[in-house]
Amino acid sequence: MQFRPSIALVLSIVGILSLEISWTDGCTCFMETRREKCQRSTFGFIGYPYFAGRTNIGGMEYNRFCFFIVRIHKGLSVVFGEPCVYSSVSSAACGTGFYSGSLSIVNGYIESGVKQVNLCGWNERWRSVPSFVKFMFLTQPNWCYA
């Protein structure tokens, strides 16, 4: 009879450890406001995603998202070229995505010459942004600058 509780104990410990391991492998972002995320970014724009595909850059798989850009709010020279951004395929590496045809705000950074976005940046559907944040963002030219 004492054998069964020890098996249950071992199984519960293994279960807890596996859960802990899976949490440490996931994406971890700092708790930041939308403004702080925007200030931390190298470039930013509002646009409609019209193309999504996969590509390989330097041996890494990325999702590629191209946009019809409506408004550039940061990094004009960066955004003015190819209207596409790249995000890791893996959500464990903080990969993100966009809804095709849905107006989105996109903020990212340059790494190894590639425009990258991730879950830790301010990247979301424009309609999900609270009205007050939209008002501050659209009326204060330096809102995204520290």
From Swiss-Prot:
Species this protein is from? Margaritifera margaritifera (Freshwater pearl mussel)
Which Gene Ontology cellular-component terms appear in the entry? extracellular region
Q: Where in the cell is it found?
A: Secreted
UniProt protein name: Uncharacterized shell protein 1
Its taxonomic placement starts with: Eukaryota, Metazoa, Spiralia, Lophotrochozoa, Mollusca
Where is it made, tissue-wise? Prismatic layer of shell (at protein level). Expressed primarily in the mantle with highest level in the mantle edge and lower level in the mantle pallium.
Q: What keywords tag this UniProt record? A: Secreted, Signal
Q: Which domain of life is it from?
A: Eukaryota
Q: Where is the signal peptide?
A: 1-26
